[in-house]
Amino acid sequence: MRIGLGLPNSALDIDRGGIFLEIAHRAEDLGFASLATIGRVAYPTYEELVVLAAAAGATSRIGLLTDVLLGPTREPVLLAKQAATLDQISGGRFVLGVGVGGREDDFTITGLGFKDRGRRWDRNLELMHRAWRGEPLPGTDHPVSPRPTNGESVPILFGGRAERMLARLVTYGIGYTQGGGTPESLVEMKARVDEAWRGAGRQGRPEYRALTYFALGEESLAGAEHSLREYYGPYGDRVWAGVARDSAQVRERMQAYEAVGCDELIFTMTAPAVEEAERLAEAATIR
C-alpha cells in the first residue's frame, strides 16, 4: 500500500502560501506517493488546482490528487481545461478526485443550484470528456482543451456513497476515493464498487484510496481541533476523534487499511509545517 500526504490547504490561519511548495518539495524527497488536497468553495481554503499546479512545478515525480474537488460547483469546460493543463504540465502525474458535495452554501455562493447538482454533474462529465477527446463543443468548431497525456481523459477517482456515483464511476472513473470513513466503511464501498465494475464489463480492477488525518507535533495538535471542527461543522467531532496522534496510531491505521485492500492511504496534514511531513515519514517508515 502506498502512502500519500494531504496538503493542509483547508487549515485555518495560513498566512504564507509558499509553505505548500516547501512541503511538496520535502514530501517528494521523503518518498511519499502523492500530494493531495481537499476543498470547498464557501470556506477560506487555498484553491486545490492552483495549489497542485504550484506543487507540480516544485516537484518532478510525486503524484497529484484532488481528494476531492466539488465537481458540480465548477463550470465544466473550464474545469476540463484546467485538469488537462495540470495533467500535461505535471507529465501525467495528476488524478482528478471528485465528489458531488453536500453543503448548500458551496452552491449558493457560486450561483449554482443545489438540488439539481447530481443531474448537472452527469451532463458536465459528458461535456468534459468530449472536450478531452478534442471534439468541438456547442458554439465552436474546433477543440477547446489540451489533450490529456494518455490521449483519452484525465484519470478520475470518484468519492461519495450514492448509487448514482457508482454509475459515474464505472462510466468515467479509474476507481474510488474515501474521505473521512473507516476501514470497515471502505470494505462496504469496495464491495459495491467491485460489483458495479463487473456489471459494467470493465476490465482490470478499480483503484482504491482513502483519506485520514494526523497531527504528530504539539503545535499541530494545538490548531488541529479548531481547524477540523470549523471545516467539518456537525461532523467535526467524529473527524477530530479519528485523528492519528502518535506513531503507533499511524502504523495501526496503515495496517487496518492495507488489510482491507486499500491501494493508497493519504494522511492529511492538520497544520502547515514541513516538520509534520517528516514526522509522518518516520512514523510510517517510508524513509
List each model region and its residues:
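Active-site-adjacent structural elements that line small-molecule/cofactor binding pockets in enzymes
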Residues: 1-287
